[in-house]
Amino acid sequence: MIRESCRWPTYPASDHYNPASGRFFNPEPQRVVRPLDAASAVAPMMFRRKDRFPPQPLPVIAPDFSPFRQPENGANGETARFIWFGHSTLLARIGGLNLITDPVFGAAASPYRWMFRRFQPPLVPAAALPPLDVVLISHGHYDHLEEAFVRRFATGGALFVAPLGVEVWLKRWGVPAERIRIADWYQQIRIGHLTLTAVPARHDCARGIGDRNRSLWAGWVLAAAGEQFYFSGDSSYGRHFAEIGRRFGGFDLAFVENGQYDRRWPDNHMFPHQTVQAALDIGARRLMPIHWGMFSLARHAWDEPVRRSSAFARQRGLPLLTPMLGELFDSRSSSSGDWWQNAAEKAKAA
C-alpha cells in the first residue's frame, strides 16, 4: 500500500479538487459512511457466504479472441465488439484498438489474499489476453486497479489511460511516464481513431494510509466509427448523469455499475433502480449492467443486482443486454436471456 509520505501532484483548483488539501471531492456531497456501519456490514461478510456466492462457478463461454488479433485498421469503420470478464473488466475491440477496462485477474479485491476473494475464476490468465493497446482505468480501488496486472503489462506496448492522480500508482509499478495518459473530467484523449473522454462520477478513492481522495474517480465515454459507448466505473446516483446525457447526446450501449450496494453506503454505489435511471438519464439506447459476477463486496445475494435491474429495465422500457461471461457481443447483439437465473436454478436442483 502507498503511504502518506508518497509525493502527490498538485492540480489546478476546480469544483472537485482543492489544491490546498491536495484532495478531490464530489460537487454533489456524499453522506459519510460511519465506521460502525462499515464494520457491521463488512465483518459478517468475512464468515458468511450463503447466497452471496453462487453454489458453483457460473457458466462461461470460451472467449473468441480472433477479432482482437486482426491487424489494426480503425479507418474501416468496424463495429466495436466486447467480451465481459465479470465485475468491471471488459475487453473491447474499438477503433481498431484492443482496450481493456479496469482489469482485475487476481484472487482478491484487496491488499490481503483472504479478504474479498473472487467467487468466479478468471476466464483466462492475464498472460493469455490478446495484445493490448489501451488499459483504461476508472479509479484506484482494489477491484478496479490491480497492481499485479499493471506490473505485468507495464513495459509492453499498451497505453495506460486514467483519471488524475492514478499516474502515481502506475509510475510506482513500473509504467513509463510516456505510456501514461491522464485526464480530468470532460478532458479528451485521442488514440488513433478512438476518442476517450473522462466524465464525472460520484464516488471516492483510497488504497492505503493517508491517500484518501488523492486521486480522481471517473467514468469514460468511448467513441469511434460513429459509435458511442459509456463506461461508468463506480458511481452513486447523482445529477451528473443528466449532464453527461446533455453533453454527449446518448449512447449506443452503456456499461453501468450494478452491484455491491448497501443502505449503509448509499452514496458510494447505485441500487438497481438507480442503475436503470442513470442509463435513462444519459440517453442509453441499451444498458449492460456490470460490477457483478466476480466479487461479493456487499451483503446482497450474488445475482440480486442483475435480477432487480433487469426487472426495472423492463418496467421502464429500456432494452437490456446481458451477455454470458466470455461471450463476444456488440451493441446490436441479442440478449442471452436470464442465464444467471438458469444457473441458480440448476445449482439448487443439483
Language-model segments: residues:
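Acidic/histidine-rich helix-loop elements
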Residues: 105-122, 205-211, 262-268, 296
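Active-site metal-binding motif and surrounding structural segment of the metallo-beta-lactamase
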Residues: 114-161, 181-182, 249-255
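Cap/insert and terminal regions of metallo-dependent hydrolase folds
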Residues: 2-27, 129, 134, 159-168, ...
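Divalent metal-coordination and catalytic microenvironments
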Residues: 92, 102, 139, 146, ...
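Catalytic core of the metallo-beta-lactamase
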Residues: 89-95, 190-251, 266, 270-274
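Metallo-beta-lactamase
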Residues: 1-128, 159, 163-231, 252-259, 308-328, ...
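Active-site metal-binding loops of divalent metal-dependent hydrolases
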Residues: 103-105, 140, 201-203, 233-235, ...
